[in-house]
Amino acid sequence: QNFGPVARVSATGSTSRQTRVIGSGPRAGEEFAVRVPTHVSALLEFEDGGSAQCVFSFQSALRRTGFLEIAGTEGTIVFPDPNYFEGDLVVHTESSEPVTVHSVADAGRGTGVVELARAIRAGVPERASGEQAFHVVDIMESMLEAADTGQWVTVESTVERAKSLPDGWDPREATL
């Protein structure tokens, strides 16, 4: 969200297998028909002119979880897996060796819910709003449309850029 709303997307998609087998849970071993692309590569253009590339895939035999890299004019930041809410950042620049920035945050998965509850109680807009969620779904639907048509697709929705949590924000702080 800190990059702001997405204006348009382009994408390609593919499906390598017509059926898949559920790998875990109560339905493990059950085969099902694949009805959507299982690999999507997308280009996103933000309203402010920035861009991003994304790959979403179930087609790799390599088991891993996501990672995030942000490249800017001075270097690249490699973030740890956002699914675990912990880990170190690594900053790469052209003029020096990579620098590891040790994580100081340990807010975890409940951060958004805690922030929502505090915002409701304070009567202020929440950061992870329904409008933001709708915009994310609109982006994903636009990616699928772009992959299907082979054309750039305008993302119809927009959303205000959410403010970052303030320095020192503590989800465990007693606020009642």
Labelled PLM ranges:
Residues G66, G112-L116, I120:
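Hydrophobic alpha-helical segments typical of transmembrane helices
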Residues Q1-S51, S57-L62, E131:
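Rossmann-like dinucleotide-binding domain that binds NAD(P)(H)
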Residues S57, P82, T158:
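Surface loops and adjacent helix of pleckstrin homology
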Residues L68, Y84-E94:
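Short polybasic amphipathic segments
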Residues S103-V113:
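Active-site loop of classical SDR/Rossmann-like NAD(P)-dependent oxidoreductases
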